Amino acid sequence: MWRSYLVFLFFMTPRIQTYCPVPVLRSMAVLNIISPLIIFVSPIKKQDSLHSSACYANLTLVEKLQLWHSMSND
């Protein structure tokens, strides 16, 4: 799981920088790719984490940012 994300990130990061010249858009695009990792990094029970990641995939970017912000404040 982690290896596939890292390989994907390794190949996608240069393309994101090419397609998104504006730094804000670039950082949002990178965050949108990295954000599913937050579910696995956060201290959630294993069975809850699988359910959360399935629900997490349906969130918009704004909702992901709000969730990430609330998790980092705990």
Swiss-Prot record:
Disulfide bonds: none
GO cellular component: membrane
Signal sequence, start to end: 1-18
Keywords: Membrane, Signal, Transmembrane, Transmembrane helix
Protein's membrane topology: Single-pass type I membrane protein
Spans traversing the lipid bilayer: 22-44
Coiled-coil ranges (or none): none
Compartments where found: Membrane
Function as written in the Swiss-Prot or TrEMBL entry: May be involved in the regulation of telomere length.
UniProt protein name: Uncharacterized protein YOR008C-A
Organism the protein comes from: Saccharomyces cerevisiae (strain ATCC 204508 / S288c)
